[in-house]
Amino acid sequence: MEDIKPNVELKSTQEQSVPTEGSELLNDYDLTKAHETENVDGTEGPANEDEDIGDDSMKVKDEYSERDENVLKPEPMGNAEEPEIPYSYSREYNEYENIKLERHVVSYDSSRPTSGKMNCDVCGLSCISFNVLMVHKRSHTGERPFQCNQCGASFTQKGNLLRHIKLHTGEKPFKCHLCNYACQRRDALTGHLRTHSVEKPYKCEFCGRSYKQRSSLEEHKERCRTFLQSTDLGETASVEARHIKAEMGSERALVLDRLASNVAKRKSSMPQKFIGEKRHCFDVSYNPSYMYEKESEMIQTRMMDQAINNAISYLGAEALRPLVQTPPAPTSEMVPVISSMYPIALTRAEMPNGAPQELEKKNIHLPEKSLPSERGLSPTNSGHDSTDTDSNHEERQNHIYQQNPMVPPRARNGMPLLKEGPRSYDLLKPPPICPRDSIKVINKEGEVTDVYRCDHCRVLFLDYVMFTIHMGCHGFRDPFECNMCGYRSHDRYEFSSHIARGEHRAMLK
């Protein structure tokens, strides 16, 4: 076996030094190969261990012979199917070479269609480049080569990793040129810039209301379609809605929207029905004839505006300061003007000469015909926009107040009630709307207390602020339309359930 290696080296050296002997070199190679095979077969001893060495030598000679063949051949290969070289690989190498060739042809045909795109062999997705295809295949394999060295989060693309790193560094490269807002993503800055724009490109074709975002418009359209289907008005309702929108001022609409959102955010200021404590006893005789029967008996818009302003002052005017100026507290100069509008119940110490009997003698009871005008003082939100009606209301109110000058509340025993000093909002609130001979609310001490009634819901309130908040929930022109979200109820039961459940919160923008 030792004689084989020198012969192989000698043969290779001779082949390199004599490149001009063409056919003789190939013949010598065949004879030498046959001679070496006979020597290997006839060699005694551990011949199996040296078979690998013989194979390596054959590979080396194959490579050299291929080089010499290329050098000696002057003409290029014309036909690949009929090669002129009488040399071929052994059977074992041909088997593997065929497998590689088949794989190459199949992958080339499937991933390289005629359009130039590459297809995913798993789902068939077409990609424009090889890099895009590799990123897509990571979604099938689950490979995430880009990993954060701080928290260990992995990503399929480098851009996502760079965006994630900004969370750790706190970098906010995208800044608003109008305010101090800064963010990490460009799309977030684009959405923020819409808040500075005055225009509202997304407009509802049903009612004409406009929004800055498409999502807000879609939510509004669902409610608007529901409204049109429930009322069954169709195109007529759309025209009326546009007319109402034109009548209502933009400033007033902004105030109401801010007020509704503020009420929704404050759970403590949500309108609540007065149930009453157990120690209070009620002596109520309700007369259904006091309900409004005509639209001309509804309250004028001046009282409605006052109720809204009182609710705004109670809920907090900081959020509404750019739109509404909170009226200041009444001073000594304003009290005479307010007293001419509303009678102020004075205590015994404030009465002249401390004699309430003189005032009681001056009290003139009103006939039954004046009851509808008293009910007109209820600060409801169902206003009738008519100048003639407003002037008639004012004339009747002045006539009533002149005949009813500052009567203190009295108990059953005929003694006047002692009250604490009037608070700031007590000077502006109207007198109780319910006639004392029809509805009386008596506390545990047997004293008659002031009561405020919502004629739409038939609910009594002992607190004027809660009464004002409740009346602010009624719609302007339809008392059973929610002033927060626009939901229209069929009766007072559905309206009360809607307010109690707070369904309007999900409808707010």
Swiss-Prot record:
Keyword hit for Transcription: yes
Residue positions where Phosphothreonine is found in the record: T20, T326
GO MF entry, a single one: DNA-binding transcription factor activity
Cross-link (Glycyl lysine isopeptide (Lys-Gly) (interchain with G-Cter in SUMO2)): K61, K73, K100, K245
Record-linked Pfam families: zf-C2H2 (PF00096)
Cell compartments where the protein resides: Nucleus; Cytoplasm
Tagged with keyword Metal-binding: yes
GO term, biological process aspect, one: regulation of B cell proliferation
GO cellular component, one term: nucleus
Region (Disordered): 1-85, 365-421
Residue span of region Mediates homodimerization and heterodimerization: 452-504
Modified residues (Phosphoserine): S378
Keywords on record: B-cell activation, Cytoplasm, DNA-binding, Isopeptide bond, Metal-binding, Nucleus, Phosphoprotein, Repeat, Transcription, Transcription regulation, Ubl conjugation, Zinc, Zinc-finger
Zinc finger (C2H2-type): 118-140, 146-168, 174-196, 202-224, 452-474, 480-504
Biased composition (Polar residues): 10-20
InterPro entries for the chain: Ikaros_C2H2-ZF, Znf_C2H2_sf, Znf_C2H2_type
Skewed-composition ranges (Basic and acidic residues): 56-72, 385-398
Family annotation (SMART domains): ZnF_C2H2
UniProt domain comment: C2H2-type 5 and C2H2-type 6 mediate homodimerization and heterodimerization.
Function: Transcription factor that plays an important role in the regulation of lymphocyte differentiation. Plays an essential role in regulation of B-cell differentiation, proliferation and maturation to an effector state. Involved in regulating BCL2 expression and controlling apoptosis in T-cells in an IL2-dependent manner.
Family: Belongs to the Ikaros C2H2-type zinc-finger protein family.
Description of how the protein assembles with itself and partners: Homodimer. Heterodimer with other IKAROS family members. Interacts with IKZF4 and IKZF5. Interacts with IKZF1. Interacts with HRAS. Interacts with FOXP3; this interaction may be required for silencing target genes and regulating the suppressive activity of FOXP3-positive regulatory T-cells (Treg). Interacts with BCL21L; this interaction blocks the anti-apoptotic role of BCL21L. Associates with histone deacetylase complexes containing HDAC1, MTA2 and SIN3A.
Protein name listed in UniProt: Zinc finger protein Aiolos
Species whose genome carries this gene: Bos taurus (Bovine)
The organism's taxonomic lineage, starting at the top: Eukaryota, Metazoa, Chordata, Craniata, Vertebrata
This protein's encoding gene: IKZF3
